[in-house]
From Swiss-Prot:
Protein's UniProt name: UvrABC system protein B
Entry GO MF terms: ATP binding; ATP hydrolysis activity; DNA binding; excinuclease ABC activity
PROSITE patterns for the chain: HELICASE_ATP_BIND_1 (PS51192), HELICASE_CTER (PS51194), UVR (PS50151)
Function per UniProt: The UvrABC repair system catalyzes the recognition and processing of DNA lesions. A damage recognition complex composed of 2 UvrA and 2 UvrB subunits scans DNA for abnormalities. Upon binding of the UvrA(2)B(2) complex to a putative damaged site, the DNA wraps around one UvrB monomer. DNA wrap is dependent on ATP binding by UvrB and probably causes local melting of the DNA helix, facilitating insertion of UvrB beta-hairpin between the DNA strands. Then UvrB probes one DNA strand for the presence of a lesion.
Any single Pfam family the record assigns to this protein: UvrB_inter
One of the protein's GO biological processes: SOS response
Comment block on domains: The beta-hairpin motif is involved in DNA binding.
Taxon lineage: Bacteria, Bacillati, Bacillota, Bacilli, Bacillales
Family note: Belongs to the UvrB family.
GO cellular component: cytoplasm; excinuclease repair complex
Subunit details: Forms a heterotetramer with UvrA during the search for lesions. Interacts with UvrC in an incision complex.
Keywords linked to the UniProt accession: ATP-binding, Cytoplasm, DNA damage, DNA excision, DNA repair, Excision nuclease, Nucleotide-binding, SOS response
Length: 658
């Protein structure tokens, strides 16, 4: 079993990194349960965490608050650990409409989902890796705290095959059907097997290129080969192979029988309750739907929406914590929560939102009450899974600070760049003042970000600046994903000099060309002007050697005072370090493609523009969409998840436009 992490990088830790690595490693070895790394923007937090993982050498779960960020982290960790198992576990839905019921209009919305086959493969690859080795890093979104099948069943049902093993061909085929593999001798793909005489070829659920060829001599396995599924080329001989189930909700036949008995008993009890309350329509609906599912489970071993019966399938009592990805890890694993100030509130909030929707389905006879146990973890349940955890954020939240107030700091950037200078100027005359600042930046070929509090203010300011001859664009929540990416790219290319927006904190706006961030109405306390938001917004000017922040305000709020104080404290530390080591700050030279695969995404959008869809015939349009879908799948195969996500969003927009 491979169990050593091997970090591969041409860089060595610089600035604050060696001290942060040393402190985090010492804390983990001392048995500290919670640690927080306060890492300023651009200080190389991922590299620090990678060094800690190598030093501590334990299986690691890295959680991010969305798929895009998880994709970026996956690419980075994959580069740092090319010889280890770096895996990706996010929701496999390209599109997901959960099952719901709206009583006001008596509308039942059926679950509708488009599953991304590539991400499903990576999820299987992640769980399989945890059973086979210890040098595993799994990058996951918050969806990893959602219910998953039992790891005990999953592990017990794997089919282990060795050369010389006595097993008949038909016994193997039955075992494969039990773990939800389909026989298909023509369309051979993931999760399927095909049979040719004494040769069985199995396409593991965690692969998409290589299959396993099992050759029999009588009732004995004579040879196992790894084969390229497309060309038939022999990749190599294998002495042993483990075939993991094709579904995480796989169940042994004896357990399935018990589960069906329990589901029938629950159905009977629930029907009595509904009829006693004179809810006859609900009772009829529930009986019809559940009996159909039971019939499918008895005949096929699964049904659509089988996860709603997961409590029965794992023989758990009501209310007991569901199994999740966290249960697949060994007991001594460590967690890393990236952007913890956003991710932890997400973890806390997922349970309540899920229960509210499902309770409605239960009340109106669409689901049995046991469906409520197919759910994400509560915060306290999540905490029980923690062995050791590291929170990573430029602005740690109250949860992290409460768990361990001793924060480890990483303030110094390897590039020598400083936190920006912050100025406060009066609101009166702010637009004229801002105009002078913009002209000054344009002359130096630098860019400006302006953040306002309201949509109307943003629109009015954008129109005013346009009339004044400024190359400006407005970025708001209604701008579609691809347009947003293109606007950011165009800012970097100089098509625009200024971007005006409300919330400029979203990932992908770390732009080296931006030397000025202007914050209007900085003294209006609230979510967008809180201490954390202000620090994050100021950080947008921290990638340029001339970085400056101007706050327009008539009074000093606590949030302003604290955020300015924190920025000045960091700046002082950075200046002292640079002077001591003779470092001159230099603006980061970052290729234009660097913003969430912006180039390819914007190019893709150009392709859409050039092919005016409204002028296409239905056939031409279908061919064009098919081509984009192929591109999306190829991007996912190449592990370029950011590009795949952008293409997916473009496709959804095209389809929505009819």
């Amino acid at each position: 079993m491979k169990d050593k992490f091997e970090l591969v990088s041409k860089y060595s830790p610089q600035g604050d990194q060696p001290r942060a690595i040393e402190q985090l490693v010492a804390g983990l070895k001392k048995g500290l349960k919670h640690q927080t790394l306060l890492g300023a923007t651009g200080t190389g937090k991922t590299f620090t965490v990678s060094n800690v993982i190598q030093e501590v050498n334990k299986p690691t779960l890295v959680m991010a608050h969305n798929k895009t960020l998880a994709g970026q982290l996956y690419s980075e960790f994959k580069e740092f650990f090319p010889n280890n198992a770096v895996e990706y576990f996010v929701s496999y839905y390209d599109y997901y409409q959960p099952e719901a019921y709206v009583p006001q209009s008596d509308t039942y919305i059926e679950k509708d989902a488009s599953i991304n086959d590539e991400i499903d493969k990576l999820r299987h690859s992640a769980t399989a890796a945890l059973f086979e080795r210890r040098d595993v890093i799994i990058i996951a979104s918050v969806s990893c705290i959602y219910g998953l099948g039992s790891p005990i069943e999953y592990g017990e049902m794997l089919v282990s095959l060795r050369v010389g093993m006595e097993i008949s061909r038909d016994q193997l085929l039955r075992k494969l059907v039990d773990i939800q593999y389909d026989r298909n001798d023509i369309d051979f793909q993931r999760g399927r097997f095909r049979v040719r005489g004494d040769v069985v070829e199995i396409f593991p659920a965690s692969r998409d290129e290589h299959c396993m060829r099992i050759e029999f001599f009588g009732d004995e396995i004579e040879r196992i080969r790894e084969v390229d599924a497309l060309t038939g080329e022999i990749i190599g001989e294998r002495e042993h192979v483990s075939i993991f189930p094709a579904s995480h909700f796989v169940t042994r036949p004896d357990i399935m029988k018990k589960a069906i008995v329990n589901i029938k008993a629950e159905l009977e009890d629930r029907l009595k309750v509904l009829r006693a309350d004179n809810k006859l329509l609900e009772a009829q609906r529930l009986e019809q739907r559940t009996n159909y599912d039971l019939e499918m489970m008895e005949e096929m071993g699964y049904c659509s929406g089988i996860e709603n019966y997961s409590r029965h399938l794992s023989l758990r009592p009501a209310g007991v914590t569901p199994y999740t990805l966290l249960d697949y890890f060994p007991d001594d694993f460590q967690m890393v929560i990236d952007e913890s100030h956003v991710t932890m509130p997400q973890i806390r909030g997922m349970f309540n939102g899920d229960q509210a929707r499902k309770q409605m389905l239960v009340d109106h006879g669409f689901r049995l009450p046991s469906a409520l146990d197919n759910r994400p973890l509560r915060l306290e349940e999540f905490e029980k899974h923690i062995n050791q955890i590291m929170f990573i954020s430029a602005t740690p939240g109250p949860y992290e600070l409460e768990k361990n107030p001793d924060v480890i700091e990483q303030i110094i950037r390897p590039t020598g760049l400083l936190d920006p200078i912050v100025e406060i100027r009066p609101i009166q005359g702010q637009i004229d003042d801002l105009m002078d600042e913009i002209n000054d930046r344009v002359e130096k070929n630098e860019r400006v970000l302006i953040t306002t509090l309201t949509k109307k203010m943003s629109e009015d300011l954008t129109n005013y600046l346009k009339e004044a001859g400024v190359k400006v664009q407005y970025l708001h929540s209604e701008v579609k994903t691809l347009e947003r990416i293109e606007i950011i790219r165009d800012l970097r290319l100089g098509v625009y000099d200024v971007i005006v927006g409300i919330n400029l904190l979203r990932e992908g706006i770390d732009l080296p060309e931006v030397s000025l961030v202007a914050i209007l109405d900085a003294d209006k306390e609230g979510f967008l002007r809180s201490e954390r938001s202000l620090i994050q917004t100021m950080g947008r000017a921290a990638r340029n050697e001339n970085g400056r922040v101007i706050m327009y305000a008539d009074k000093m709020t606590d949030s302003m005072r604290n955020s300015i104080g924190e920025t000045e404290r960091r700046r002082k530390i950075q200046i002292e370090y640079n002077e001591k080591h003779g470092i001159t700050p230099k603006t980061i030279k970052k290729e234009i493609r660097g913003i969430i695969a912006a180039t390819s995404a914007a190019d893709e959008r150009e392709a859409v523009k050039q092919h005016d869809l409204s002028k296409m015939s239905k056939k031409e349009r279908d061919v064009f969409i098919e081509g984009m879908e192929h591109e999306m799948k190829e991007a996912a195969k190449a592990l370029d998840f950011e590009r795949a996500a952008e293409l997916r969003d473009a496709l959804l927009e095209i389809k929505a436009e009819g």
